[in-house]
Amino acid sequence: FDLVRNADILVENYRPDVMGRLGLDYKSLRKINPRLIMLSISGFGSDGPESWRPAYAPVIHAETGLIDRAARRGNLPPQDLPVSLADTNASLHGLIGVLSAVIMRDREGTGQHIEIAMIDATVFTDEQILYGLEGSEHTGPEPSQIWDTPIGPVVIATDIRRLCDLLSAE
């Protein structure tokens, strides 16, 4: 507990029950250091029917549809992604939460406990998955493309409906 007394931020990514069993849950640690900011990253959140499950990036990639989508786009058999999007997305969402908590702690003087579920961070970061789940892939943002023009290459990245409106405007 000596480390906790002087700690600024604690980051852990166990299943939600592990830190409590070790006596290291936020409620206990906050008694030692009320300014502590704790980030907990789990696969499926701290409550709910899947919260007990351990998670690894390939599991999250599969359950969010990333593996299926990549396989269909490339006409390949399903395989894990070459990068760990689930870990990266959860970490970035966690970082935003921690930075916000630091600002709040500077104003209020107390820390916070931030919880990030890898599955939530991954689903809500990949808008293409959401469009696919809603059955509206053809109305969502289109992939960007580089076009050769007389004045040089031009990148177009926009919602296709908005682009059509702009192109037909005088």
What are these regions (language model features)?
Residues 47, 61-170:
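Acidic, glycine-rich segments within the central catalytic cores of soluble metabolic enzymes
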Residues 49-53:
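Conserved NAD(P)+-binding/catalytic subdomain of aldehyde/semialdehyde dehydrogenases
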Residues 15-16, 42-43, 64:
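Short glycine-/small-residue-rich Rossmann-like dinucleotide-binding loops
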Residues 39-41, 56-62, 69:
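Generic beta-sheet signal
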